Amino acid sequence: MSIAKKLKFQDLKKGTASLLKGLVSVVIGGGLIINEFLNYFSSIENKWILWILSSVLVIYGLVKMFTGWVVFQSANQSVGEPFFGLLILPEPKAPLQNDEEKYAFLIDGFYESSLILHDDKESLAELKNNPLHRRELSVQYGDSFALNDFYGIYNEAESTVKSSLSNSWDINSSEEAREQIAALWDGAMEGAEMSLMAYSNAEDLIQSIVELGFDNKDMDAEKINVSGFDLVRTIWVARHSYVAGYIEAEELRAISRNVAAFTAANYANWQELGYSYLVSYLDWLENAKPSFAYNMLKERVYAVSQYLSQQHSPLAGTSLDELRAYFDSLPVGEN
C-alpha cells in the first residue's frame, strides 16, 4: 500500500472512529433524556445534574459525529479547480523590480497555487468562460498572495497574516521571523546535497504523488535534490514576514535574490522543482500526520501539476533558462 493510500485509510479510520464515538454519546445522552421524560428517574433528588450530564453527552456526540463526517468526506471529495487569476493583480500597486523578484515569487506560487482551488458551481461556470476569473469571495477574503506584486496582498485578509505566522510557525516578532527564515534556508542548502532517492522510502514517496496525478516522465529522481519544500517555504515565510512588518523590504529583496539564484543553479526546469517540492512535502506530511493529511496531499499534487502545465498559469511563458540568462547578463561581481 502506497503512502497516499495509507494516509487516506488513516483519515477514513479517524472519521469512522469519531462518528461511532459521537453516535454512542448521542444514544446514551438521548436515552437518559427520554428516560427522564418518562419519569424513570423520578426518585432522583438532583435531577438537574442528570439533565446537564445528558445534554453534555448529546452535544459532545453531535460535535464528534460532525467532525467525523467532515474528515470522512474530505478523504473522498474531489479537488477544486485552480483560479490562477487570483495570483495576478490586474494593476500591481508595487511592481516587481527585476527577474530575481519575479522568479522568487513564482517559486512561492508552488504553495500559493494550493490556496486557490475552488469547486462551487457558480465560480466554476465563470472560470469556464474566463480562465483568469477572479472569484469575488477569494478577492475579498482569500489567503493567497499575488505573484506579480511585491506586497502581494490584494484583499481584506491582511490582518490574518500575523495570526497565520503565529499559529503555524510560532512567529511573533522580527527575531523569530529571521530565525525561521534562516532555518528554512539552511534546510534548503542541506537538501541540495541529498537526492530524492536518498529517502529510505523514496520509491513509496514517488509512487504516491504519481498515483495522484503528478507526471514525472523523463525525470531522474537520482539527479534531483530534496531542497524543494524548504526552498518554497523560505520565500513564503519571507513574504508573509514582510507584510506582517517583521522584516524590511530590502531583506525580502535579498532573500528573493538568493532563492532565485539557488533555483537557477539547482534545477534544470520548473518540473524538477515541482518534483522535489512534492516528494519532500510528502516526506514531511507522512511524519507530521496532521488532520486531513490525504486531502492536503491530493490538493497539493493537483495544484502543483496544474501550476506547471496550464497555459493560464503564472509559470506559462517562463523558464529557468531565462532566469539563468538573467544572472549571466549581470556585471561581473553581481551574479
Question: Language model features by range: what are they?
Answer:
Residues I3-K13, A17-K21, N35-Y40, L50-W236, ...:
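Polar/charged low-complexity regulatory segments
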Residues S43:
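Membrane-interface catalytic loops of GT-C/OST-like multi-pass glycosylation enzymes that act
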